[in-house]
Amino acid sequence: MKRTICLILLAISLLCPATAATRRALIVFIGDYPESTGWNKLASANDRTIILKMLKDNAFLPENIICLQDREATHDAIVNALDRLLSLAETGDRIYVHFSCHGQQITDQDGDEALINPRDIYDEAIVPADACIAYGWNGYKGENHIIDDVLNRYFNAMTSKIGKRGCLLVVNDACHSGGLERQGADSDTLHFRGTFDAFVQPFEGSPEKPGIQPVTWVSISACKDFQTNFEASIDGKRYGRLSYAMARSFHAGMTAVQLTEALTRTYKSMPLPTGKAQTLASFIPEKLKNKKLFGQ
């Protein structure tokens, strides 16, 4: 009898994974920038409410959610949170990362962007609470902007740790406002994220050899790189357009393709300023297109 029980337990242990996959999240919402930074206020607090509810409704446990808001979301705090998320990640984990804040282009110091587009001299960056709007603003030189090269290294490291059974979804409601939309935009009446002006630094170069980092995760951004990321007014409240669409569209059993299709439908139903356009931007690695993002 004891031998039979032992054999049953052994069979169960072989059939079940050693550790259950965990749903983890890092969510960053910055709307109340210090006046000293030069950035205008955003409605990111409203985004926080609906994204936290979305995660709760999709079985993310509070202890597995790292949330930074407003002035606590400094450069160091965001980097420390990324370090923590990376250290916690295990094989098979499903990870959700969300940025709801300002975004800005910044001088590309290592030349990697030009490998894709020879005319591109800027990196993309998210703007923490302690980053200023322009070079020299209150003595600021750009040290607190977090560029896409840095984020990509974290995300590639995460996908390496979680492996083929895991999945990483990165949602960026922090796009810069593209230059082609500059004409006719009125910042007094239209609420948008980012700025038309790039953060231009003196070019110093980088000791790192430029290279293109592969994208091994699902990436969704609020707009194309030449468009403006407008906030949406819904029932008298402002929201980030992508944050609102995510909260309305996302459920854990979706594939990446199903999610982008649902987001596009929601986008079309949302109001936009007269004469303006905003199109969802996404990148899905071929092997992840039909994979359930947060399913089993």
Regions found by a protein language model. Give the residues of each.
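Bacterial N-terminal signal peptides
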Residues: 6-14
